[in-house]
Amino acid sequence: MLQWLHSCWPFGKYRRQKYVPLDTSSSCPDRWKIEIEIAQPPGVFVGDILQNSDSDASLRQAYLLAVQLNNITDYLKRFDEASVPESCKSVVQTQITKLKSVRNIIWNTMLSMAVGGVTIDDAALKTLLDKRAGESIALIEMEKLATAIVMDDSKAWAKEINNIILSAEHEKQILVNSEVPLIECETLAAEKTTTPAVSI
């Protein structure tokens, strides 16, 4: 009878599924694994870090470094895909070079943690994570620049920036040129006022 009713139920036979929460007791949460696997250099795996004698500390440090590295990689991908105007290429290229140098430092650190079984001091880790702190303003400007490059095909904003830079340089040159004659006049006046030496 129940088998016959099963075929008549509009949504199929009711089966109660027990909720099984994610395992939080593991020393390596899934999110940590994903972040580290994305950021690891080629040939290095999470298992290499777990073999470390102080695996808990090294795993936490590897996760923090991985998050930082993945953010840097995201910036680099966005600027590789964007077409940067000529007037902005020098600024963008400088920031890209800095980000690539930080990425190489983090990769070398991860290799040392995986292969050499080393952990880094918390103070050194904080310094490495705050490596971009001094460049935060430049990164904000890069964020605006990347958004503008992607959204605006006309590049009118780049022309405006270029005009502002050129006008500022022009004003500076005018100021320098206006100061030069004053200096020359002062030196000539000083030469005229000097009394010639009288020979006896």
Curated annotation (Swiss-Prot):
Q: Where in the cell is it found?
A: Virion tegument; Host cytoplasm; Host Golgi apparatus
For this record, the Gene Ontology CC terms, alphabetical, are:
host cell Golgi apparatus; viral tegument
Transmembrane region positions?
A: none
Q: How is it modified after translation?
A: Phosphorylated.
Lyase as a keyword of this entry, yes or no, is no
* Keywords in alphabetical order: Host cytoplasm, Host Golgi apparatus, Lipoprotein, Palmitate, Phosphoprotein, Virion, Virion tegument
Covalently attached lipid (S-palmitoyl cysteine), positions: 8
Per the record, the similarity remark reads: Belongs to the herpesviridae UL51 family.
* Function comment: Plays several roles during the time course of infection, including egress of virus particles from the perinuclear space and secondary envelopment of cytoplasmic capsids that bud into specific trans-Golgi network (TGN)-derived membranes.
Relate the assembly described in the record: Oligomerizes. Interacts with ORF42; this interaction mediates ORF42 incorporation to virions.
What is the protein name for this chain?
Gene 55 protein
Q: Which organism is it from?
A: Saimiriine herpesvirus 2 (strain 11)
